[in-house]
Amino acid sequence: MPIEIPSDLTPELVPFAWLLGTWEGNGFMGYGDAEQRAFRQRVTFEQTGLPFVIYRAQTTLLDEEGEPQREATYEQGFWELARPREDGDIGPGMLPPDPVPVLTSAEDVEKLRNADGGFDISVSILQPGGVAELYLGQIKGPRVDLRTDAVIRAQGAKEYQSGTRLYGLVNNHLMWAWDMAADGRELATHASAELTRIEPAAPSGS
């Protein structure tokens, strides 16, 4: 099925068009000696007209019958193309961007394509418990590969060293997998899920 691109989508977000909307589905999590648990997750990738995607994920543990048991965790962040920032871009702080986007056409965006044929991206994700991750990677067609470039932990936060995340669109389902290195262990499987889009991308500003 062709990927639908919202008519009001800023050119810089076209590589992310296949992610936009709300997704829901089930998966499994575990790590080290922790018991493997089934979960349900709702993930939203939202565009507002600015050159970044707002990411939110809500995870609920399931019981042995597959029914919701209790909330597990939330995370949220921002996905964007990794490129040098210019005077017309947002920030620093609350300083707004220029009304006209820095990248105004598909041709401008195409110039950012890397040697592998994809686009370099940065993804910042904040987790409860005082952990913030900065991922670098690429988006190439309906696939995203990410690896942590930096992890910030608040004093008293649990030990978390690094992570990798993989996202892909397979038969119109969003598949993702997360490996992490934590608690002094090497990078290993942590969680994965298969999600179905339940709401299409909303128009910017809605």
PLM feature spans:
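Soluble ligand-binding/transfer domains with enclosed cavities or grooves
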Residues: 2-7, 13-201, 205-206
